[in-house]
């Protein structure tokens, strides 16, 4: 944190994870006991009161934050982005996310299992990313070539020297726009 001027949180390609983990991550950026998500189900037992960020000592993080999303950012990553957007803590940059705002329960059935959607989750403002996704504040079109370079970048250690050289000259358009966005905050 010392000397940090801004943070880019890259959630591109992140398929999600546990709701509780997303709430814990949000606790790194928001004050304790901030309401960040609630669930709404057809059955009242699947509707929850708002989940809050953890009660823990939080370092003062006043630097600007940009969250990077793409069409493959889903579920818990959408919750993190949506809550930070709703609470004006981050600028969302990139593409509209996947649109998976569902809460699912796995029901074991012998040698198989059934995954049943029991609710949708909602950001602090009450919106759900289900089907519509999280719409970025700064939209950036990502070309197929940029998408391929991003995949290469993530496995850079396994690339040949020639492949690394191509990446050395590549400028990630989403990161570039995110840096512009945080420099204006």
Regions found by a protein language model. Give the residues of each.
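Short, well-structured beta-strand/strand-turn elements
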Residues: 72, 87-100
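Short acidic, Pro/Gly- and aromatic-enriched capping/linker segments at domain boundaries
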Residues: 110-120
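Extracytoplasmic/secreted proteins, especially bacterial periplasmic and envelope-associated proteins
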Residues: 20-24, 35, 75, 79, ...
């Amino acid at each position: 944190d010392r000397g940090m001027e801004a943070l880019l949180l890259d959630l591109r390609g992140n398929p999600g994870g546990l709701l509780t983990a997303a709430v814990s991550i949000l606790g790194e950026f928001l004050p304790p006991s901030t309401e960040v998500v609630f669930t709404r189900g057809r059955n009242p037992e699947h509707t929850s009161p708002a989940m809050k960020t953890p009660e823990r000592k939080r370092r003062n993080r006043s630097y600007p934050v940009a969250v990077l999303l793409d069409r493959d950012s889903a579920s818990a990553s959408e919750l993190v982005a949506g809550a930070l957007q709703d609470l004006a803590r981050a600028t969302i940059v990139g593409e509209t996310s996947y649109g998976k705002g569902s809460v699912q329960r796995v029901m074991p059935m012998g040698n198989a299992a059934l995954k049943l959607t029991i609710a949708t989750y909602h950001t602090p403002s009450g919106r759900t990313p289900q089907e519509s996704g999280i719409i970025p504040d700064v939209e950036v079109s990502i070309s197929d070539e940029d998408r391929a370079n991003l995949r290469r970048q993530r496995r850079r250690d396994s690339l040949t020297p020639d492949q690394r050289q191509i990446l050395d000259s590549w400028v990630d358009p989403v990161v570039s726009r995110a840096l512009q966005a945080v420099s204006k905050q």
